[in-house]
Every structure is written in C-alpha cells, then in structure tokens.
C-alpha cells in the first residue's frame, strides 16, 4: 500500500481585469494497494472548485487480466468560463497472454458534460504485443475515437498562436507499430 499527496501553490495567475480574485492552490491525493493478482487505486484532485475523483482496479487470473476505471469530474470554471458542469467517465480493459504474445482490448467513455450537450466521446482500442525478451517488445494497435458534435478528443486540426485547436465533432482513428525497450 502507498499513498501520496501534493499541494501546488498559486496555480492560477492573477488576472489584471479581476483584481479581487486571488490565486488558488491545487491539491492532489492518491492511494494504491497491490496484493498478488489484485491492484486497486483511488485519486482525487481539487483546484478552484473544480475536482476529479477516480477509482481503478486490475485483476489477473491465469492468462487473463481485466481492468476498470471510473472517474467523476466537476468543472465550475476551468473549461468554460461559466463551467461545463459535471460528468462521469469509465474505461474497461482486457488482456490475454499466450506465450510471448499479448492481445489487448479496451473501451473508454467520457460522458457528456451536464452543461454542454452532445459532448461525449467513446474510444475503442485493439492491440497486440510480442515480447522479444523481458525488456523488449514489438507492438501494434488500432484506436478509434467517436466524438459527439461538441466533443474534441483526439488530434489537433491546427495550431494558432502556439495554441492547439481541435475541431468539435470530428472522429479520429490511428494505427501504430513500434518497438519498446526498457533500459
């Protein structure tokens, strides 16, 4: 078991147009528990009345590993000036190991913000890893993101003034092939 926390001081710079608004501290807490095939975790972040709370679990039995993640967000003023509201997010994952091969599948969902209609998105991923050794593997995966008309998860469509801009409602997909080596 381990737990940790942090405080980030003055995470919002003073706005000259709002001289009475102070700078806010950000707070983070996390706890994790590992016991054999079971791994559990929880996390909480808070900043300027915005928060996220999350729970996760992972369980391995034989050649199978299954995992789940749940997160609750509340945004009063960070994403939109008036706040996007609240939402729930989740992810389910699975892995099957056969000799040096790993087969992966997962799906994640970010539900719509309560104050932003049609802002949900769903991501699907299929992957395959082949372990060449304990430290080296080759991998490939395909992922697809389906955005609601007011959601913009995925890749940037352009950049302006050093800001990444994503267009709402665009669906994205990607394919990857690579090698990973841990030194």
Q: Locations of the language-model features?
A:
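Acidic/polar low-complexity surface segments
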Residues: 74-75, 147-151, 158-163
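Short loop/turn motifs that connect adjacent beta-strands in outer-membrane beta-barrel proteins
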Residues: 132-138, 169
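Detector for outer-membrane/organellar transmembrane beta-barrel domains
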Residues: 24-131, 142-144
């Amino acid at each position: 078991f381990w737990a940790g926390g942090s405080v980030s001081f003055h995470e919002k710079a003073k706005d000259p147009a709002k001289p009475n608004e102070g700078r806010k501290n950000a707070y983070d807490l996390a706890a994790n528990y590992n016991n054999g095939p079971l791994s559990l975790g929880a996390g909480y972040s808070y900043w300027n009345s915005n928060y996220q709370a999350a729970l996760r679990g992972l369980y391995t039995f034989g050649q199978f590993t299954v995992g789940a993640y749940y997160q609750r967000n509340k945004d009063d003023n960070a994403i939109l000036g008036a706040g996007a509201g609240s939402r729930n997010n989740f992810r389910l994952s699975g892995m099957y190991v056969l000799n040096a091969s790993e087969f992966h599948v997962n799906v994640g969902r970010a539900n719509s913000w309560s104050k932003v209609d049609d802002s949900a998105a769903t991501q699907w991923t299929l992957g395959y890893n082949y372990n060449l050794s304990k430290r080296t593997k080759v991998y490939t995966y395909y992922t697809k993101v389906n955005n609601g008309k007011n959601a913009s998860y995925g890749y940037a469509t352009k950049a302006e003034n050093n800001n990444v801009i994503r267009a709402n409602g665009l669906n994205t997909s990607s394919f990857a092939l690579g090698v990973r080596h841990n030194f």
